[in-house]
């Protein structure tokens, strides 16, 4: 590859090529001209353009072309791409033999993943916290089970394992914390509350399937949190392997594989056969070392609530993950708008430590109320201080809710209705057998009601548990059971926490319930309907109230609940809400054509004689 450089004098009046906003680096040798070489590969052309291979592959996908970093491109395609970066593609001179650029695989360095320096004293190495995410049936739980080397699914109903939403494993003398959060919604709620809850994300994709919407949703949340991502290509032991297709698609979302010149590790695994797990654990430790995760274990505890529920024996219980400091039995903590004295702590093995260190998950009791998943908790000096903090938080919440709404504008309301995001119905599904579960999943995937979406956050065999209720509460999900009988205590807990459980023994009844729920979520469509028109004939100034327009109704009917548009010489001066409609001194509901009335508007006083006020309302459009 040869670049035809020009001297500074020749280029002084010309601008340099415009580069993509997503460029990770700019090569010093990127110039106005590029000498085309048919042997140049995608990653080499990207270097010339001053962009990453991932950006160039994404551009090619937008053109409908699939390529990897080692693929060559036709000249017309290169010319099309070069135009965007103000680069001219020229033919090489016959006597020239363009030298080839050597592949430059970007190493995984601290510059990519460097954590902010911690200025606290007595900093010590902290175990990484890892979240496993992905589509509901691509093997997240199986991978967690395999890493933990216990059958969590089998022991959920009466075994010795204590489900606290997170657990630790040890590998090569290093501890790693895994969060057992089977849905990205709860993860996103934690991030939305300001919790840096996880250090690394494992994105699980089944190679016998493909990239699903829930896969991309999970990816989006991980990228928002700005954490390293490891792609686990699961079920490699099965036929119909679509690894290349998956890598190609995820590359367009800035997950360029290391073997293609990117920085994202793609690990082939079989969670069921426990193959490839050591490689994942090695990369987790590598990412942890690069991020230089450190905290001060000697200070007061701070961390995040992972799960919370109401236990019939212990009262409010919550799973804490400590992000800084240490938590001890007897500490006073504030968690969201709850507080209390830690009475007991348990880990996932039902051991009862008296102290929990950074990245350690523990299930605690002693809080006055059930906090929410994602709430920040921290230890305070005494109960009086905790009460004061919680009281102030609750007061601020009430003040926020009590704030008067801003002046209404009909066009703004219509725009809000039009741009409102499609609603989603979150579902947690439990069934008696794997066959029933798969049949229900297939039927639920086919449900279509308007533009509403069904998100199946969890699907598993077995009865409904306290863990399901806690997850349904935190993710605002509908909990559905097929051919199962939950324990009375579980149903009672769901009632206390206001979690709706639906149990059926006939599959189509479940589908009907879901469709009915979706139909109830459909928001009506509205349109603006003009109700009347008035002419301003007098202006009355009322102290402490403002100007009232004395009007004559020339068309239709004016109602006291209408919106108003003030016009002068065909120019719209104001759009807003009618505050008051009067006849003489009396408040009236409406004024008909040929009648007089007084109009007071919310936010407008500058009336002039002969102004026109057009009134309108929102009318529901029948489907």
From Swiss-Prot:
SUPFAM superfamilies: Initiation factor IF2/eIF5b, domain 3, P-loop containing nucleoside triphosphate hydrolases, Translation proteins. Residues 134-141 are annotated as: G1. It is found in: Cytoplasm. The keyword Cell membrane does not apply. Residues 180-183 are annotated as: G3. Keywords: Cytoplasm, GTP-binding, Initiation factor, Nucleotide-binding, Protein biosynthesis. GO terms for cellular component: cytosol. It holds the Pfam family GTP_EFTU. Residues 234-237 are annotated as: G4. Residues 1-18 have a biased composition (Low complexity). Signal peptide: none annotated. Residues 159-163 are annotated as: G2. GTP binds at residues 134-141, 180-184, 234-237. Residues 270-272 are annotated as: G5. Residues 1-21, 92-115 are annotated as: Disordered. GO terms for molecular function: GTP binding; GTPase activity; translation initiation factor activity. PANTHER family: TR-TYPE G DOMAIN-CONTAINING PROTEIN (PTHR43381:SF5), TRANSLATION INITIATION FACTOR IF-2-RELATED (PTHR43381). Belongs to the TRAFAC class translation factor GTPase superfamily. Classic translation factor GTPase family. IF-2 subfamily. One of the essential components for the initiation of protein synthesis. Protects formylmethionyl-tRNA from spontaneous hydrolysis and promotes its binding to the 30S ribosomal subunits. Also involved in the hydrolysis of GTP during the formation of the 70S ribosomal complex. This is Translation initiation factor IF-2. The lineage of its organism: Bacteria, Bacillati, Mycoplasmatota, Mollicutes, Acholeplasmatales.
